[in-house]
Structures are given as C-alpha cells and as structure tokens.
Amino acid sequence: MIYLDTSSLTKAYVSESGSDEVRQLLERTSESIYISSLSLVEFRCALARRTRALTLTDAESQRIWASFEGDVDDGVFDVLPVDNDDHINARRLIDAVAPLPLKALDALHLAIVRRARALLGTSFVTSDAQQAAAASALGISTQTIALKI
C-alpha cells in the first residue's frame, strides 16, 4: 500500500514541482492508495491558501476540490480515520525523533502511517523534507517527491 501525505496529495491535483512524478506514481501503481481523514482538511486548507494567494482562482479551487471529492467517492483513495491512539502515538513520535523537528500534523500523519504499516504494510510518500527525515528515523519506508525544506 502507498500512503500519501497532504504535501504529495496536493501535487496530484495542483500543478507544481513534483506533480508529474506524483501523477505517474498514482497512474502506474497497482497498490491501494491511502490518505487519512486529516488530509481531507489539510487539502481543503491548501486550496484555500492558494486562492487567498491568488495562485488559484476560486473557480479553479472549487473545480479541483470537486475532482478530489469525486475521486474519494469513487474509491481512488482509501481514507484512514484518525483515532485517539494516533494522537497519543503522535506525541510519542515527537520525542522518539528528537532532536529532528516534527510539526504536530506531520507527527499525526506518521502515527497513522505506522498504524497502517502494522496492519497492511505501507510505503510513505511525502514532499516535506523534515517529515521525510523523521519517517526515515522511525524506520518507515519513504519515497520523497520534490522535497520542500
């Protein structure tokens, strides 16, 4: 299985550095593609941020969101819920990777990946350099695309 964090998920819908690579990965894989319910919120936020910054029009943002929702509804992505244990484990991961910097929501993604990996086996795809470093420190198989530092 492949787990996309929101930085990589966004590249599938918004043209930016690494978009072609993410799109090719999604087109070529025969594995299940997982995201978390956290990604639903983060992706909506990413579109709103781009609309405020005028890199997307409101119409473009709405079209992209509708396309994404359609893909979720059509089962392109399996959406993993975030549960209380993920929050507890995210707090533990912050300590486990110290002194590496790890943002709160990145820690939560990594906790979800670790839970999914234990159940399903997984590869983690991210475009966030700090999150990739933390994932590697935790022994999570990580693929990076157009890293943002």
Please report, for each region that a protein language model flagged, where it lies by residue.
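Noncatalytic, solvent-exposed loop/strand surfaces
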Residues: 17-20, 24, 52, 71-79, ...
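Helix-adjacent hinge/juxtasegments
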Residues: 49, 53-83
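Well-ordered alpha-helical segments within folded domains of soluble proteins
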Residues: 42-44
